[in-house]
Regions:
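DNA replication initiation on ssDNA origins
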Residues: 1-98
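Acidic di-acidic motifs
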Residues: 96-108
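Short acidic, S/G/P-rich loop/turn micro-motifs used as interaction or catalytic elements
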Residues: 107-110, 146
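Short amphipathic alpha-helix segments
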Residues: 109-123
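Conserved small/polar residues in nucleotide/adenosyl-binding loops
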Residues: 161-163
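Mg2+/Mn2+-dependent nuclease catalytic core
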Residues: 155
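Histidine-centered divalent-metal-coordination microenvironment in nucleic-acid enzymes
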Residues: 102, 120, 126-151
Length: 163
């Protein structure tokens, strides 16, 4: 594993490696995104993503198992790690991206638009979008390591989960 424990200043975050993208939730071959615009394209402009999202939302009320199969065909972005091209487990860890994802499910529709709008204005938010169900919110953001942090990327993320 090649996990960095170095802290990056804010200006260096712009040069940090980009997250990996997989062609589906089950794929093991990935490539790094080239830019933040790639994320926007895959989420907001990609015809395949749009088609799968529409199919998923229609099927959720009819057949949740079939809807789940549709969801697994969707692209997958791993914000925190740039993987080596062939692999999807920690043994294929290549680089830390200094990104993380906040994932909120079952957000009350009354406040969802407000939350999307508010999160979109954060200087750390790289992408803000509704989940495939239309009832959740995802925020991909950049972070800086705390000064003097010697944890590996995995240790840092695990410690944040348990706060």
């Amino acid at each position: 594993m090649n996990e960095s424990s170095d802290s990056l200043p804010l200006e260096e975050l712009e040069k940090a490696p980009m997250p990996s993208i997989f062609s589906s939730l089950r794929a093991t071959v990935s490539k790094p995104l080239q830019s933040v615009l790639d994320i926007e394209h895959y989420i907001k402009c990609n015809q395949r993503t749009e088609m799968l999202t529409q199919q998923y939302r229609k099927l959720m009320n009819v057949d949740t198992k079939l809807a789940g199969n549709i969801k697994r065909q969707s692209i997958a972005i791993c914000p925190s790690i740039q993987f080596l091209p062939k692999g999807r487990t920690l043994e294929y860890f290549d680089k830390e991206t200094y990104w993380l994802m906040l994932d909120y499910d079952h957000v009350i529709s009354l406040v969802l638009d407000e939350k999307v709008e508010k999160a979109s204005h954060s200087k750390y938010a790289m992408a803000v979008y509704r989940t495939i169900s239309g009832k959740g919110l995802r925020i991909l953001l950049k972070y800086m390591r705390p000064a003097g942090c010697t944890l590996t990327a995995t240790e840092l993320h695990l410690s944040l989960i348990h706060i």
